[in-house]
């Protein structure tokens, strides 16, 4: 992999920090590199269902945020086309959930990802995601080096 230009990495970091859904879900920290991302959030009562446990939509959305950061991490604007999630166990108020997305394959137009959500060492949900990679670039196409654009 080529060296990621630091000014562009900083710019993408600011874009990810501004994500309104991540903010509203209390995403407190995230890590990312090209093709991968990890985000974390603590389940609050606002995201429980009528049974008093974590709503599946909370887990789905947290996984989707990790997917969006991972798929946009090369600088190209990418959009989720399909996400298929399996819930393995419920989560409780106060649980810190970590969602990680890892790129499995990437072509010029599409990329696929494996997504895992954990509470501690326990897998609570897993998913696969397929994204569409547009021709548009975050921060303006002209800001990205030509060799980076050709490679990614």
Name each model feature, range by range.
Residues 1-152:
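Terminal targeting signals and extreme-terminal segments of soluble enzymes
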């Amino acid at each position: 992999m080529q060296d990621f230009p630091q000014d562009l990495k900083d710019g993408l970091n600011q874009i990810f920090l501004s994500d309104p859904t991540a903010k509203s879900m209390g995403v407190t920290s995230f890590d990312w590199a090209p093709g991968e991302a990890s985000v974390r959030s603590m389940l609050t009562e606002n995201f429980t269902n009528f049974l008093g446990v974590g709503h599946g939509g909370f887990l789905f959305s947290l996984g989707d945020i990790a997917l969006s950061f991972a798929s946009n991490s090369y600088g190209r604007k990418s959009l989720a086309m399909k996400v298929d999630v399996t819930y393995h166990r419920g989560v409780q108020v106060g649980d810190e959930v970590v969602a990680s997305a890892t790129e499995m394959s990437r072509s010029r137009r599409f990329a696929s990802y494996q997504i895992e959500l954990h509470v501690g060492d326990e897998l609570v949900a897993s998913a696969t995601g397929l994204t569409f990679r547009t021709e548009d670039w975050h921060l303006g196409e002209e800001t990205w080096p030509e060799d980076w654009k050709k490679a990614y």
